[in-house]
A protein has these predicted regions:
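Structured, active/binding-site neighborhoods that engage oxygen-rich ligands
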Residues: 1-219
Length: 219
């Protein structure tokens, strides 16, 4: 129900919604909240908070599934959300990149044995989890800090806003976000979303860096 509330309150976001979600909103307005069997990458791009709100792999898997299947109930849509949320959990818990790579490859069967340089010239646009979540994770794995990860994701091309969103959710948990970037993004939010973010971070934490030093942290 939450995706409908946000969609109804923000019907015309910059860039618009994906066609599947837009159709779902129209159906929901008439009382039909059935998910639309999507494996689109929207499930992965919105799931990052689950990796902050829960502290075990079992809980993160369960609630990432719940987050996804309200709209994206295709197995691949659920898997993409779960993989992203597990990356966030492991990143904020201090696990190394190779542990993250191994865990995701083993648990979800994603091939992460490539680099951004190797796919940049041939990667094509894809809007499903199978074509974006592994690439977004590798953009993080190849990065040296938060900004570097985002640049990697954008440089691949394709559905770059979603790629960068997925990559960024993992990179914050692992590296932290420079304070000036955090403030720039935060100040672009509506008052409602500023309140949502503030309340969430007060309860579950974040990683904000001031001159390389952690100023806020995981609670």
């Amino acid at each position: 129900f939450a995706p409908y509330l946000y969609g109804a309150n923000y019907p015309h976001p910059l860039g618009g919604y994906g066609s599947g979600f837009q159709k779902w909103l129209w159906q929901a307005e008439n009382g039909n909240f059935e998910p639309y069997t999507s494996c689109g990458n929207g499930s992965a791009m919105r799931v990052g908070p689950v990796g902050w709100a829960f502290n075990t792999i079992e809980d993160v898997l369960e609630y990432a599934k719940h987050s996804a299947e309200s709209t994206h109930n295709h197995p691949e849509g659920i898997k993409g959300a779960q993989a992203t949320a597990i990356c966030v959990l492991l990143g904020r818990k201090g696990f190394g990149k190779e542990k993250i790579r191994s865990e995701i490859s083993t648990r979800f069967g994603y091939n992460l044995n490539f680099t951004c340089d190797e796919i940049r010239d041939t990667y094509k646009w894809g809007g499903i989890c199978q074509d974006t979540v592994p690439q977004a994770i590798v953009a993080f794995l190849d990065g040296n800090d938060f900004e570097d990860c985002i640049r990697n994701a954008v440089s691949i091309g394709g559905d770059s806003d979603t790629l960068a969103c997925i990559t960024g959710s993992i990179a914050e948990a692992y590296f932290g976000v420079p304070e000036e970037m955090y403030k720039e993004a935060f100040n672009r939010l509506t008052p409602h979303f500023k309140n949502v973010v503030t309340e969430f971070e007060e309860k579950f934490g974040n990683k904000i860096l001031n001159n390389g030093n952690l100023t806020k942290k995981d609670v």
